[in-house]
Amino acid sequence: MRTISIKSPSRLQAPNGAQLTTVAATVAMLLATSLSTPKAQAAESTESEELATVVVTGSRIVRRDFESSTPVVTVGKELLEQTPDFAIETKLRALPQFAASGASQFNANPATGGTGAATLNLRAIGDNRNLVLLDGRRLMPSTSNFAIDVNTIPASLIENVETLTGGASAVYGSDAISGVVNFKTRTNFSGIRFDVQHGSTFKNDMPNTDATLTLGANFAEDRGNAVFAVNWSDRGTIRQRDREFYRRAWATSYPASPVTIIQGAYNPTIGNNLPTEAAVDAYFATFGAPATAVSRTTSLGFNNDGTLFNATGAVGTNIYNFTSGVPLRQAVSTTATGGKVVSEYSFVGQELAVPVTRTSLFTKLNYKLNEYADVYLQAYNTHYDSLAESGPIQLGNFWAITVPRDAAHPVPAPLATILNTRANPNADWVLFKTTLYTGQRITEGRSDVSQIVGGVRGTLGLSDWTYDANVSSGRSQLVTTGVGGYVKNALAETLFDAPNYGANYRDSNGTCTSGVSPFGTFTPSQDCIDYMTVNPKNRTELKQHTAELNLQGGLFDLPAGDVRAAVGASWRKNTYLFRPDDALTIARSSNQDTDFSGTFVT
């Protein structure tokens, strides 16, 4: 079978100048017109080659005319190889049909995919609303929402990528609402090929190295072909502080909240036990604040000398008595007049790109049994290690610390004066604080994705009817381990609740020598940090089993061409299992999770 190309007048221009062919309704109309004149077509048959039959993504019908009711964009291997970025999802995002996805190389949040996975988001509907196929068959899902990690696809064997931009749920099922992306691999490869690439960004960081060895050979008098490929890839990282536009963004636009203040802050709005406005006015009047300039609902930050400052206002003009020496910046707020302030700290140390090391094995075998049957087998396994880093834990909102109001928990005199004006002066008060001293959250990810597909295809011997029957089995497992910065809130609460804020505290979980003072930029002793931090390990496992049978062929002829039909049946079973670490199943733990498992059959 030869590859043919029919170009429509409409083309998409790629960044490097390559033209991407689209097959649209206008082409279908022209071809339908030509089919209505069989005599003219016959007269020209001696001068033109016969068109090869192909299957266009979006229909299971084999045909010669490339008709499609919705646009199909085909990206060839030349464009994929010439695009300087190594990531497949980044190469395809050069097309307007693709939007940014939740899981990509530029996502360092382990809660949203920052573990090395890369998914596709067709038409910005969601990465689990488009179907990703390999040679027309389903791939093994890799994420909790059953999206496909395209890192598992052997890039060196990709011949082209077909993108159907219209909904295809009638043909492929409900997971093809936004369209279909079909990766087609090379056929009948014979020989040895070694590819190696190395590159970096324009700032000479985030180094990338990719090496692939491909072996292929024909056998049994060319009735069969076997291909084996091994790929190794290593990608470095970029931190957000390495880019000026990120540093500016953190300096002006991070959502304002007292939870980001590393000095700690008293939040009076939780618990419906506000101090009086008169007490707040009297305190801040000594620093030149007009009456009601600081509302009694304002969170009050703690200076290192025990005095208070307000966390609402414009930096340099309406922030009163800030003396801690920790840089403040203003964050734009649409809900507070004058804006809010937050502490400058190591958000910019967060990764912009996740470092990943990946190893992939892929094999493909085809063998022609007879004129009616070809058997095929395809299998792959991809393993990758990643290291995602995000900001320190914030003790606030749902994870806020409730501090007892008693003699065993002394507070600075200015705070005591304000707390004593509450309707219930002896009630607990609420602390918001970022635990900068516990460090950045660092998550190691280890993932394995494997799948095996086997089937038989051929002709039925009835006119031109063909069949394709296959089964597949796959498994995906992701293990993430927190190796730094994760706080078990229940243990942090234990220290803050203990007399003298946990100074010289000891129980079965460990010791705390210095205690964990809520006030100022106090850094506790290492044993206190060890007491409240954990190294959680979570396991996510997905399994998929499928069976599919498809038949297609011609029914009868009409003046405009033959009428063809396709009929098929499919069965699919998916199972999902999530087992979080015991430390994260306890109420109010940071990154809290619960066990979950389920199965669905379609």
Listing of model-derived features with the role each one plays in the protein:
Residues 70-119, 137-150, 163-169:
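Periplasmic N-terminal accessory/gating domains of Gram-negative outer-membrane beta-barrel systems
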Residues 144, 238, 244-253, 308-357, ...:
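Surface-exposed, low-complexity loop segments enriched in small/polar and acidic residues
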Residues 139, 152-197, 239:
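A beta-strand signature from Gram-negative outer-membrane beta-barrel systems
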Residues 123, 164, 184, 195, ...:
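Transmembrane beta-barrel domains of outer membrane proteins
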Residues 197, 222-278, 341-348, 390:
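Periplasmic-side early beta-strands and strand-to-turn transitions of outer-membrane beta-barrels
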Residues 80, 92, 161-162, 181-183, ...:
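Non-catalytic regulatory/gating segments with a bias toward low-complexity or hydrophobic composition
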Residues 162, 189-217, 228, 344-353:
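Short strand-turn segments of transmembrane beta-barrel domains in outer membranes
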Residues 1-96, 123, 212, 216-217, ...:
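N-terminal Sec signal peptide and the immediately downstream disordered periplasmic leader
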